[in-house]
Swiss-Prot record:
Negative regulator of class I heat shock genes (grpE-dnaK-dnaJ and groELS operons). Prevents heat-shock induction of these operons. This is Heat-inducible transcription repressor HrcA. It comes from the Bacteria. Gene3D superfamilies: 3.30.450.40, Heat-inducible transcription repressor hrca homolog, domain 3, Winged helix-like DNA-binding domain superfamily/Winged helix DNA-binding domain. One of its GO terms (molecular function) is DNA-binding transcription factor activity. Pfam families: HrcA, HTH_DeoR. It comes from Corynebacterium aurimucosum (strain ATCC 700975 / DSM 44827 / CIP 107346 / CN-1). GO terms for biological process: negative regulation of DNA-templated transcription.
Length: 344
C-alpha cells in the first residue's frame, strides 16, 4: 500500500473523529464528502471507511447508520495530532488574569480547576503539592494582641498556613521579634519533617523569658505540620459530566473521581513537566472510567534537568472530547500556574 493511500485514510479517520466530536452523530461518506476537502470520490471514501473499520479504528453502530470512532481510533487520532488548537490572545490574557488573582497557592490551584472546568466543559482536578518534599521558606509571627499571636508558615512551593496562638501571659514587641528570629533560624530551609524535629528540640534551649511563648508557638506549628496530608485534591465541574452522554455510568464515574487514590494514579501517569498525558477509555485502570478520557499534566518549577514537579492537574470527560482544544487548555493552565508559583 502506498504512503499516499495511508495518508489519505488518516485524513478520512481524522475527518470522522472531528465530525463525531462536533456532532456526536454517526458519520457517513456523504457527510465527509460535503464537509471536508478530501479530494477523492464518494466511492473511494467508502472504501477507505471499510478498511478503517476492518482495522478496528471505526465501527458501525447500526446497519443503516454511519460510522463512529472506536477507542483505538481515538488513540490513533491523538497520537497523530501534529498541532493543538492555539489559544487566542484574549483567552490567554483572561486565563492569566484570573489565576493571578489568587491570594496564595491553594487559591491559585482552586482557581485553576474552576478555570479548566469552565473552558473545557469537563470535570477538572488538581493535586496540591506533596508536602513531603516541601521546605519551610519563612515563618511570620504577628502580635494580634498582647496575649494572641498569628503564625504564618510559608513553604518554598507557595503553600501558606495560618494559625492563631492564645498565650498564657503578655508578650511585648521585643519578645515577638526574638520569637520570630528563633523560629526562622530553626526552620528556614528545613523539610516539614525536619522542621517538626527542630521545633520539638527548640524549647529547652530558648531564653527563659520567652520560653512559655515559644512552647505555645512550637506546639501549634508541630500540630500544623502533622495535620498536613501528603496528597490533597481539589475538583470542579463534575456537573459538566451530566451534560454529556455518560448518563448510564455517571454515578460510578463521579464516585471514582471522589476516590482520591484513583485520581492520583491518573495524575501520576504524566512523566514530567511539559508533557501532557492522554488516557482513553480502556487505558484507564479504574473500570468506572473506561468510558472516559483523561488529559493530564504537571505543574511546578524550572525546566529540563532543573525541573521540579509539585503536582498534577487535568480533566476527565467523554472519549469524544475535543482533544486538540483540551490538550491546549490543560497545558496552558499548568504553564500559567507554574509561572505564578515561580514569581515570573
Amino acid at each position: 500500500m502506498s504512503s499516499s493511500t495511508d495518508a489519505r485514510r488518516q485524513e478520512v479517520l481524522r475527518a470522522i473523529v472531528a465530525d463525531y466530536i462536533a456532532s456526536q452523530s454517526p458519520v457517513g461518506s456523504k457527510a465527509l464528502l460535503e464537509r471536508y476537502q478530501l479530494g477523492v470520490s464518494s466511492a473511494t471514501i467508502r472504501n477507505d471507511m471499510a478498511v478503517l473499520e476492518a482495522e478496528g479504528l471505526i465501527a458501525q453502530e447500526h446497519a443503516s447508520s454511519g460510522r463512529v470512532p472506536t477507542q483505538k481510533g481515538y488513540r490513533q487520532f491523538v497520537d497523530t495530532l501534529h498541532d493543538v488548537k492555539p489559544l487566542s490572545k484574549a483567552e490567554r490574557r483572561a486565563m492569566l488574569t484570573f489565576l493571578e488573582g489568587g491570594v496564595d497557592l491553594e487559591d491559585v490551584l482552586r482557581r485553576s480547576v474552576q478555570l479548566l472546568a469552565q473552558v473545557t466543559k469537563q470535570a477538572a482536578v488538581v493535586q496540591l503539592p506533596n508536602l513531603k518534599v516541601s521546605r519551610v521558606k519563612h515563618c511570620e509571627v504577628v502580635a494580634l494582641s498582647p496575649v494572641r499571636l498569628l503564625l504564618v508558615l510559608i513553604t518554598d512551593n507557595g503553600r501558606v498556613d495560618q494559625r492563631n496562638v492564645e498565650l498564657d501571659d503578655v508578650i511585648d514587641p521585643e519578645q515577638t521579634h526574638r520569637l520570630r528570629d528563633i523560629l526562622n533560624t530553626a526552620l528556614e530551609g528545613k523539610t516539614l519533617t525536619e522542621a517538626s524535629v527542630e521545633l520539638a528540640a527548640l524549647v529547652d534551649d530558648s531564653p527563659a523569658d520567652i520560653r512559655p511563648h515559644l512552647l505555645k508557638a512550637a506546639t501549634t506549628l508541630i500540630e500544623t505540620l502533622v495535620e498536613q496530608p501528603s496528597d490533597r485534591l481539589i475538583m470542579a465541574g463534575t456537573s459538566n459530566l451530566t451534560r454529556v452522554a455518560l448518563t448510564e455510568g455517571l454515578p460510578s464515574i463521579i464516585e471514582a473521581l471522589e476516590e482520591q487514590v484513583v485520581v492520583l494514579k491518573l495524575l501520576a501517569r504524566v512523566p514530567d513537566l511539559g508533557n501532557v498525558s492522554v488516557s482513553i477509555g480502556e487505558e484507564n485502570e479504574a473500570d468506572e472510567l473506561r468510558q472516559t478520557s483523561v488529559v493530564a499534566t504537571r505543574y511546578g518549577f524550572g525546566t529540563g534537568s532543573e525541573a521540579a514537579a509539585l503536582g498534577g492537574l487535568g480533566v476527565v470527560g467523554p472519549t469524544y472530547m475535543d482533544y486538540s482544544g483540551t490538550i491546549s487548555k490543560v497545558s496552558a493552565v499548568a504553564r500559567y500556574v507554574s509561572e505564578i508559583l515561580a514569581g515570573e
